[in-house]
């Protein structure tokens, strides 16, 4: 068989290991092709046969060696026809798509239309792909966010300030929650739990009066801003951390500073957890291909690897809920809007 591998959407630590592992396993029996720049690579025929030897030197770095894009191959029927034509010309039988909801959704649509068979691997630092407990990149991003927050905390203590740390998270507050819990932040704001900024200001002022510094962690997605959208209709996010810091300073009269971690936590080397997760996911994807199990996404469920139909995953988000929401409300019960 001819198998294509692509990475779509935002980059995340662990992508290169997933690609390398799949290629290393599949090249024993099949021709494996790197599809560069995600789905755009199939529209532009940016496809090249690769071996594990080509990928080994980059396997343990952040980012994605085979590049990525946010191109939607089904934005219109003209693109869809071009995709189908190119797939036939290239002779591809299967695509292994590594990405978040949009990338996986395109894989599912390609499967549904009979353009080519597809297997999905969940990846995003936001950890919001439905149907799996963990996505490639989340653990690495959280560890980077924790390290940066602890460094920021030392300056808050030294200068006796209130600090606001803004982290990524469009719909889901997993990074903010895990970072806040790990650094014992005085307040954490996540998209799933509307919070009163007056309550936040009151809480951090109380903390500041106790020890002369305070810390807030906020998810970028608690407030969307207008402006350009990508091809999947998502707004550009960012800036809420600075706005919240200004609000706290006005409300309390205490100097407040904000830092936006942004893309810096996305490009770090993968942690041990993400490395092993990427290997497990890639191995499961290979086994799915070998067994003709298509239209599925590999998933992590209670420590085991499982398969979930892609159609059951796309269009949904895994949000902070259940146990994790109870934990949030236990630590920060006084932030309700």
Curated annotation (Swiss-Prot):
Molecular function per GO: 6-phosphofructokinase activity; AMP binding; ATP binding; diphosphate-fructose-6-phosphate 1-phosphotransferase activity; fructose-6-phosphate binding; identical protein binding; metal ion binding; monosaccharide binding
Regulation (activators, inhibitors): Non-allosteric.
Pathway, per record: Carbohydrate degradation; glycolysis; D-glyceraldehyde 3-phosphate and glycerone phosphate from D-glucose: step 3/4
Binding-site residues for Mg(2+), renumbered to this chain: 101
Compartment(s) of residence: Cytoplasm
Annotated GO biological process: canonical glycolysis; fructose 1,6-bisphosphate metabolic process; fructose 6-phosphate metabolic process
Broad EC category: transferase
Pfam families: PFK
Entry keyword annotation includes Transport: no
Superkingdom of this protein's organism: Archaea
Catalytic residues of the enzyme: 126
Positions marked as site (Important for catalytic activity): 123
Keyword Magnesium: yes
Catalysed reaction, written as an equation: beta-D-fructose 6-phosphate + diphosphate = beta-D-fructose 1,6-bisphosphate + phosphate + H(+)
Cofactor(s) needed for function: Mg(2+)
Residues binding substrate: 124-126, 161, 168-170, 220, 257, 263-266
Cited Gene3D superfamilies: 3.40.50.450, Phosphofructokinase domain (3.40.50.460)
Site feature Important for catalytic activity and substrate specificity, where: 102
Swiss-Prot/TrEMBL keywords: Cytoplasm, Glycolysis, Kinase, Magnesium, Metal-binding, Transferase
Family in the record: Belongs to the phosphofructokinase type A (PFKA) family. Mixed-substrate PFK group III subfamily.
Summary of the function given for this chain in its UniProt record: Catalyzes the phosphorylation of D-fructose 6-phosphate, the first committing step of glycolysis. Uses inorganic phosphate (PPi) as phosphoryl donor instead of ATP like common ATP-dependent phosphofructokinases (ATP-PFKs), which renders the reaction reversible, and can thus function both in glycolysis and gluconeogenesis. Consistently, PPi-PFK can replace the enzymes of both the forward (ATP-PFK) and reverse (fructose-bisphosphatase (FBPase)) reactions.
Subunit architecture: Homodimer or homotrimer.
Protein name according to UniProt: Pyrophosphate--fructose 6-phosphate 1-phosphotransferase
Species assigned in the record: Thermoproteus tenax (strain ATCC 35583 / DSM 2078 / JCM 9277 / NBRC 100435 / Kra 1)
């Amino acid at each position: 068989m001819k198998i294509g591998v692509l990475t779509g959407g935002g980059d995340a630590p662990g992508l290169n290991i997933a690609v390398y592992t799949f290629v290393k396993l599949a090249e024993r029996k099949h021709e494996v092709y790197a599809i560069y720049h995600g789905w755009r690579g199939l529209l532009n025929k940016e496809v090249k046969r690769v071996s594990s030897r080509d990928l080994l030197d980059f396997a343990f770095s952040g980012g994605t060696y085979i590049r990525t894009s946010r191109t939607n191959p089904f934005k219109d029927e003209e693109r869809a026809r071009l995709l189908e034509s190119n797939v036939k010309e290239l002779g591809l039988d299967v695509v292994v798509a590594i990405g978040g909801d949009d990338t996986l959704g395109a894989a599912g649509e390609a499967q549904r239309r009979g353009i080519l068979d597809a297997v999905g691997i969940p990846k995003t630092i936001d950890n919001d792909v439905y149907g799996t407990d963990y996505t490639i990149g989340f653990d690495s991003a959280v560890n980077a966010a924790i390290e940066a927050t602890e460094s920021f905390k030392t300056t808050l203590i030294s200068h006796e300030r209130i600090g606001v740390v803004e982290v990524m998270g469009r719909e889901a507050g997993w990074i903010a929650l895990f970072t806040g819990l790990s650094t014992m932040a005085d307040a954490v704001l996540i998209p799933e739990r509307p919070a009163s900024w007056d309550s936040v200001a009151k809480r951090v002022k109380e903390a500041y009066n106790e020890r002369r510094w305070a810390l807030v962690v906020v998810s970028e997605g608690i407030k969307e801003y207008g402006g350009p959208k990508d091809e999947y209709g998502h707004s550009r996010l960012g800036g809420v951390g600075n706005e919240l810091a200004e609000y706290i300073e006005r409300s309390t009269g205490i100097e407040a500073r904000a830092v936006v971690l942004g893309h810096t936590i996305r490009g770090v080397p993968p942690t041990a957890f993400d490395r092993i997760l990427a290997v497990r996911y890639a191995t499961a994807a290979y086994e799915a291909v070998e067994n003709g199990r298509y239209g599925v996404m590999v998933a992590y469920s209670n420590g085991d690897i499982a398969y979930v139909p892609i159609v059951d995953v796309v269009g949904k988000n895994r949000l902070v809920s259940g146990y994790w929401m109870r934990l949030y409300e236990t630590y920060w019960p006084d932030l309700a809007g």
